[in-house]
């Protein structure tokens, strides 16, 4: 009995096997049966006689309708077996042999894109069957694995890698969208209330209102309390940490009780800013707001010798040392106020300190001042403030040199009110300049109250005054500053030293304050006798300790 290599047809496809050429005894009984004749169909390898019958049938009827072969011929084969035999072995355009280099390259490229789609690959390779392509690929995998070579060439691997990444990203995005949609549906269908624990955690980091007030006071005094924990939660209305003092050595005697003198954060958040559109308010130490002060300035808070500004305040370009005369500044005025009657009077070049005080604090703005002149660059940097300071000082010195000998009474007193109440005999004294030489500043002599001036005692009030002279080279620094008092810069501890020609008598400052406040404030004062054995220095002498409630804490 001889054995040959043949191709057997099966439902799984075509495969090679070694079998006996003669049919098995039970092949007919176990074979396929035809529907009409109930004949048993033959299985197993094809014979040359069966191949000839199939070739003749295809030449006459063409390809297709493989189930009709059994009807028109004596071939006892099913339609599937006839189709596979013709496609894999008997068709005339079938290519036999090994694959060419071009065919191998095309198979590798198509497998990188399609995968194990053998039938689709066979359509692009005419004359090659899907079974041949599959056998070639499996053989290639085993051969390259043994040699340790990559399955795909480098150029094909890079292209396939990009394609795989894009495909993976698209799948990840699709899966992520599905998960979000499912989470959203679960969140919408849930009956439990949603608790925002993160908000509670953030609220725990925020300090309380009392802590914030302490924090603001300490930050503005430069005590180093601006920790990084509170900086990110600081309200936008409060001054930023960059505007805080660099060190706390300027007022080393300030204690923790300063927090009572500053407004709480609730005041800054709830109080509306009521500002005159043409006013640029500034105050040396405006920590408490009195009814009289609220008429001329908006709610503000500013510490001297600092550039910290709140509620649109504009800092002074030059720190003020020594005694500052309590008077409405040049930047603080209204259109309908009585200060429009003031006339700008330049101060003599006594010193740089007095020039800065007269220019920024004492001299009221002229009537032709525009809104742009009132320090219009409110939100600009420090350069504009320095230029503004230089401009004012230059104009003051220039007007001093070009002015006539006839000058006003003083830069801190109301010239209009004084000249109206002065008798005719005293006008010559003022015009001659004799009185001005002895009454240049508050630090050189004493001033009487407006009631005495109106009574006609102008000449007699200043008859016994003695001009007090001080050396200008004297250097003095305050030993103690009580910043909790609104009259800290006018207290006797500052004035008793007599530095820079500042008046050493507090009665003169009270008189100037009475002249500034008008009749309403001046009439509310009560004359207090001197406790010492010396005679009273003037009719309008008052004590700071017995001031009315409007000025005391």
Curated annotation (Swiss-Prot):
GO terms, biological process: anther development; anther wall tapetum morphogenesis; gibberellic acid mediated signaling pathway; negative regulation of cell population proliferation; negative regulation of growth; pollen sperm cell differentiation; positive regulation of DNA-templated transcription; positive regulation of programmed cell death
Phenotype of null mutants: Reduced expression levels of aleurone-related genes (e.g. CP1, CP, GASA1, BXL1 and BXL2) in seeds. The triple mutant myb33 myb65 myb101 has a male sterility and exhibits slower protein storage vacuoles (PSVs) vacuolation rate in aleurone layers upon seed germination. The myb33 myb65 double mutant is defective in anther development, with a tapetum undergoing hypertrophy at the pollen mother cell stage, resulting in premeiotic abortion of pollen development and male sterility. This sterility is conditional, fertility being increased both under higher light or lower temperature conditions.
DNA-binding residues (ranges): 66-90, 118-141
Subcellular location: Nucleus
Pfam families: Myb_DNA-binding
Origin superkingdom: Eukaryota
Domain HTH myb-type positions: 38-90, 91-145
Disordered: region residues: 1-44
GO molecular function, one term: transcription cis-regulatory region binding
Gene Ontology CC terms, in alphabetical order: nucleus
Gene3D superfamilies per record: Homeodomain-like
Tissue specificity note: Mostly expressed in roots (e.g. root tips), stems, pollen, shoot apices, flowers and floral shoot tips, and, to a lower extent, in leaves and siliques.
Induction note: Repressed by microRNA159 (miR159a and miR159b) in vegetative tissues. Specific expression in floral organs and in the shoot apices is regulated via miR159-mediated degradation. Slightly induced by ethylene and salicylic acid.
Protein keywords: Activator, Developmental protein, Differentiation, DNA-binding, Flowering, Nucleus, Repeat, Transcription, Transcription regulation
Predominant subcellular localization, coarse grouping: nucleus
Function: Transcriptional activator of alpha-amylase expression that binds to 5'-CAACTGTC-3' motif in target gene promoter. In vegetative tissues, inhibits growth by reducing cell proliferation. Promotes the expression of aleurone-related genes (e.g. CP1, CP, GASA1, BXL1 and BXL2) in seeds. Together with MYB33 and MYB101, promotes the programmed cell death (PCD) the vacuolation of protein storage vacuoles (PSVs) in the aleurone layers during seed germination. Together with MYB33, facilitates anther and tapetum development.
Protein name (database record): Transcription factor MYB65
Originating species: Arabidopsis thaliana (Mouse-ear cress)
Gene designation per UniProt: MYB65
